[in-house]
C-alpha cells in the first residue's frame, strides 16, 4: 500500500520556508533512493529565495503540478529548472525557479549518520549517479537489497 503524505502538511512546510524558517521532514517515497531512503531518513531543508544561484545536483523542495516533492536539480531549459528523482528512470519535472521553496542542507540517516548535502564529494557522487540513469533499472534493485 502506498502511503501519501497529505499535501496540506507539505504546504505548511512550504509556508515556513517562505517565511525564512528551516524545516525537518521524514521522507516517504522512493524517488530519491539510494541517497534518501523513504520512511527511514529525515532531511533538513533551508529556505531558497527563487533568485539566488542554485547549485547543480542539489536536492530541492518544490511544487510541481500542485504536488510538493523533493528531487534533484539537474539543469535548466528556457529559463526553467529541470528536476529528477534519484530513483526515477525517465520523468523530469520542469518548474519555474519561483516554485522552489528550499534546498536540502542535511540528510539524517536512520543509522545516526548525517550527510552534508553541499559537500563537493557528495555532489560528485550524485552527478555520477545521474549519468548512470540508463542502467539504474538494474542497479536500484541490487542497492535495495544491500542498503535497505
Predicted regions and their residues:
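Extended hydrophobic leader/signal-anchor segments used for secretion and membrane insertion
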Residues: 1-148
Amino acid at each position: 500500500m502506498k502511503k501519501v503524505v497529505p499535501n496540506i502538511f507539505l504546504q505548511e512546510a512550504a509556508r515556513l520556508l517562505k517565511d525564512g524558517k528551516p524545516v525537518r521532514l521524514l521522507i516517504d517515497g522512493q524517488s530519491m533512493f539510494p541517497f534518501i531512503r523513504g520512511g527511514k531518513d529525515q532531511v533538513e531543508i533551508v529556505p531558497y529565495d527563487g533568485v539566488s544561484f542554485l547549485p547543480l545536483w542539489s536536492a530541492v523542495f518544490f511544487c510541481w503540478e500542485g504536488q510538493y516533492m523533493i528531487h534533484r536539480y539537474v539543469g535548466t531549459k528556457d529559463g526553467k529548472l529541470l528536476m529528477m528523482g534519484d530513483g526515477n528512470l525517465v520523468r523530469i519535472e520542469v518548474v519555474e525557479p519561483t516554485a522552489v521553496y528550499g534546498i536540502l542542507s542535511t540528510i539524517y540517516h536512520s543509522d545516526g549518520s548525517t550527510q552534508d548535502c553541499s559537500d563537493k564529494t557528495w555532489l560528485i557522487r550524485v552527478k555520477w549517479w545521474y549519468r548512470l540513469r540508463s542502467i539504474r533499472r538494474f542497479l536500484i534493485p541490487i542497492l535495495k537489497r544491500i542498503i535497505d
